Amino acid sequence: MASKIETLKANLEAALGARVVSLTEAIGELTLVVKASDYLDVATTLRDDPKLRFEQLIDLCGVDYQTYGDGAYDGPRFAAVTHLLSVTNNWRLRLRVFAPDDDLPIVPSLVDIWNSANWYEREAFDLYGIVFEGHPDLRRILTDYGFIGHPFRKDFPVSGYVEMRYDPEEKRVVYQPVTIEPREITPRVIREDRYGGLKH
């Protein structure tokens, strides 16, 4: 008798065929990778196929692979990773799609398939700059509307570009260039034989 994950894998391969770029198992969960051009079609099949029935999108996030594997990674930079749940069959699936263009990452929106994707896609847009084509209201959700850049990208500076402060003369919040100076932090080594001024 096949295990639940083997049954799911067989059902996915039968339903999706050549649209599967890769299907891997790790830590008891399957990860399905598809092309951006097949993303909506695959998502609809995952939801509607009677042998799959992924009724719920439970999470969606962006990923920046710029420094993945200590810089040895040589694939597309940005991906949207979706976690799906089938309540009917009691199984989960991770669905990954890579944006074909690193300079302007665009993937289709899943809002018309699972409306729970709405705010998740807005968050991935806000933090990574991934554009979800067809999203009904793609605007920032966590950062300020005037925020410059996307703070979860690997090339975004830790200190940011600007800082905000309240200006009592103007009686409003103003932006100004970051005043934090870059510094190198060197850890202080405390030797056991001189710890706390005690000599052993």
UniProtKB/Swiss-Prot annotation:
Main location: membrane
UniProt-listed InterPro entries: NADH_DH_suC, NADH_quin_OxRdtase_su_C/D-like, NADH_UbQ_OxRdtase_30kDa_su, NADH_UbQ_OxRdtase_CS
Catalytic reaction annotation: a quinone + NADH + 5 H(+)(in) = a quinol + NAD(+) + 4 H(+)(out)
Documented EC number(s): 7.1.1.-
Record has Membrane as a keyword: yes
Superkingdom as given in the UniProt entry: Bacteria
Subcellular localization: Cell inner membrane
SUPFAM superfamilies: Nqo5-like
Protein name: NADH-quinone oxidoreductase subunit C
Species annotation: Burkholderia multivorans (strain ATCC 17616 / 249)
